[in-house]
Regions:
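Nucleotide/phosphate-binding catalytic cleft detector across ATP-hydrolyzing
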Residues: 1-157, 165-284
Length: 285
């Protein structure tokens, strides 16, 4: 084993993967790989692969290795991690082969899902591997003292999962992980445009709509202007132009937002019950 370690932290996300070196974000790329169908070799990773989605090319297929916050395609995930590490800026590259990785995982991951993350990272070059639950990493990243006795609650809406956790003394006091998040919002928008405007749109277009006019409330003080969306009529394939408002998007996201609200309330309910038990045990002592 090498005497030196190249240390990197990876936020392995459903939508985007972030790599941190020496406390600095050095890569933030879409979690997408493009693979040549003939020999299964890697064509592109991240931003270079993302535009190839939904192109219908026969010789190249695009894969999102993670789904709902967990690895859905082991080989593609390994290729993505290797490809992203190879993309690190020269100042963060070295001749060292030994890599120490810290990787985020959803708090609701099963043992099998965690094993898949470990295997994928080790195949991608990790010699030392540490896993941290995503809400804990989010709290640390926000500068919260997770070791403090005062509790804090984190609600982290990612691409594949929404992570909810109450943290105190470096531990989860209560937590929830639901597979309703950014990708679900995108699918809601795709379904809405199909159903309401008879328009067929891609996932990247839905992502742009979400970012430009996405909202969880029907009334906003600083409301965004309507967004002009261009896409084919699903029946005739002729081009359509539709102005989409934030109120429309808020309406089509209502059910998913309600599921997140319910999950937050469940976590708060468990937190309150746990606090009552803790208080009772303290009184009993």
């Amino acid at each position: 084993m090498s005497l030196f370690l190249k240390e990197i932290a990876i936020d392995l996300g459903t939508a985007n993967t972030i790599i941190i070196c020496n406390g600095e974000v050095v890569l933030n790329e879409p979690s997408v790989v493009a693979i040549k169908t003939a020999d299964e070799s890697l064509v592109a990773v991240g931003k270079k692969a993302a535009p190839m989605q939904d192109r219908g090319a026969e010789r190249i297929r695009t894969v999102r290795p993670l789904k709902n916050g967990v690895i859905a395609d082991f080989k593609a995930c390994e290729m993505m991690i290797r490809g992203l590490i190879a993309m690190l800026p020269k100042s963060h590259k070295s001749f060292l082969e030994t890599v120490k990785m810290v990787v985020c995982v959803p708090s609701g991951s099963t043992d099998a899902e965690i094993r898949t993350v470990i295997d994928s990272c080790q195949h991608a070059g990790a010699r030392e591997l540490y896993l941290i639950y995503e809400p804990m990493a989010a709290a640390v990243g926000m500068g919260i003292d997770i070791e403090a006795p005062e509790g804090c609650m984190i609600v982290d809406i990612g691409g594949g999962t929404t992570e909810i956790a109450a943290i105190s003394l470096g531990c989860f006091v209560a937590n929830e992980s639901i597979r309703v998040a950014g990708d679900s919002f995108n699918q809601d928008i795709i379904n809405y445009m199909d159903r309401t405007h008879n328009m067929r749109i891609s996932a990247p277009t839905a992502e742009r709509i979400k970012k430009e006019v996405g909202a969880a409330l029907m009334e906003l003080d600083d409301a965004p202007e309507d967004m002009l969306v261009v896409g084919p009529n699903k029946t005739t394939d002729l081009p359509l132009k539709v102005a989409v408002s934030y109120q429309e998007i808020a309406r089509c996201l209502e059910k998913d937002i309600a599921q997140i609200e319910t999950a937050v309330l469940r976590a708060l309910g468990r937190l309150l019950r746990r606090c009552i038990r803790i208080s009772w045990s303290v009184v009993s002592i």
